[in-house]
């Protein structure tokens, strides 16, 4: 983990209220594991807490990385107003990402994402492709209007799409998409999305030997000191055992934490 003033190279609104930001700096050299996140200081004196945003793509050759975020409040609204040439105070990479150590060439791997949980799965899919694995994507969005990076994912492997309103792909949610299209027994399952989607994936694959889920949580420090992002551990009858999403996660094995 390091801290750096990174330079903004580009900013693009890829869907309504959803932005892709390209950053450049030496900090990119520390970014190796898909699924980790950056803790970014909002460039406003009245907003003290950093915002955790997952890493979407990494390019070591150009020392650049990309993040994708949705405007949810004052902090992300401030990010959306930044322009190329400006700088951001970035801390990272943080958290435990997806573990690819057991993946072999020709392994079929399921990547399951929903909405704003999709971004970290792009770098994951790209690294799986480099290993020689076969990524298969299952993605859900509210509608076609808020979809993004469709062509980029399709260049990496087979993609199955669902939208709540049926405007693109199957009409329904990701769980319904899995019921219809997830016909193989994959070597691994990786997922990132909201709690409802993760609960569906967890129930379906909790007995799989290599199923990993990236959890979302509100964070303050981002380094495990404040205990503001804890999740309870599955099977703990006392209700006292917990794990920190920012430090021990955000990626946990399926079945480990209560969703």
Over which residues does each language-model region extend?
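Local cysteine-cluster metal-coordination motifs and their immediate loop/turn environment
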Residues: 216-250
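FNR/FR-type flavoprotein reductase catalytic core
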Residues: 74-218
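Ferredoxin-reductase
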Residues: 2-84
């Amino acid at each position: 983990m390091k801290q750096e003033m990174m330079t903004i190279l580009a900013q693009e609104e890829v869907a309504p209220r959803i932005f892709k930001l390209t950053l450049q700096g030496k900090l990119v050299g520390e970014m190796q594991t898909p699924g980790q996140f950056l803790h970014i200081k909002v460039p406003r004196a009245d907003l003290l807490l950093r915002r955790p945003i997952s890493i979407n793509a990494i390019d070591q050759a150009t020392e650049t990385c990309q993040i994708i975020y949705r405007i949810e409040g004052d902090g992300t609204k401030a990010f959306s107003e930044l322009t190329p040439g400006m700088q951001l105070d970035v801390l990272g990479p943080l958290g435990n990402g997806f573990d690819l150590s057991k993946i072999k060439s020709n392994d079929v791997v399921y990547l399951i994402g929903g909405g704003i949980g999709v971004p970290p799965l792009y770098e994951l899919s790209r690294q799986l492709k480099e290993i020689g694995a076969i990524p298969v994507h299952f993605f859900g969005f509210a509608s076609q209007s808020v979809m993004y990076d469709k062509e980029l994912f399709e260049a990496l492997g087979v993609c199955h799409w669902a939208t709540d309103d049926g405007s693109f792909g199957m009409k329904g949610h990701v769980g319904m998409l899995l019921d219809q299209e997830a016909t193989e027994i994959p070597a691994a399952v990786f997922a990132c999305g909201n709690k409802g989607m993760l609960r569906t994936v967890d129930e379906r694959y909790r007995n799989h030997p290599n199923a990993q889920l990236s959890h979302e949580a509100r964070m303050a420090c981002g380094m495990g000191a404040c205990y503001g992002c804890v999740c309870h551990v599955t099977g703990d009858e006392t209700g006292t055992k917990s794990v920190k999403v920012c430090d021990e996660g955000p990626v946990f094995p399926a079945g480990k934490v209560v969703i």
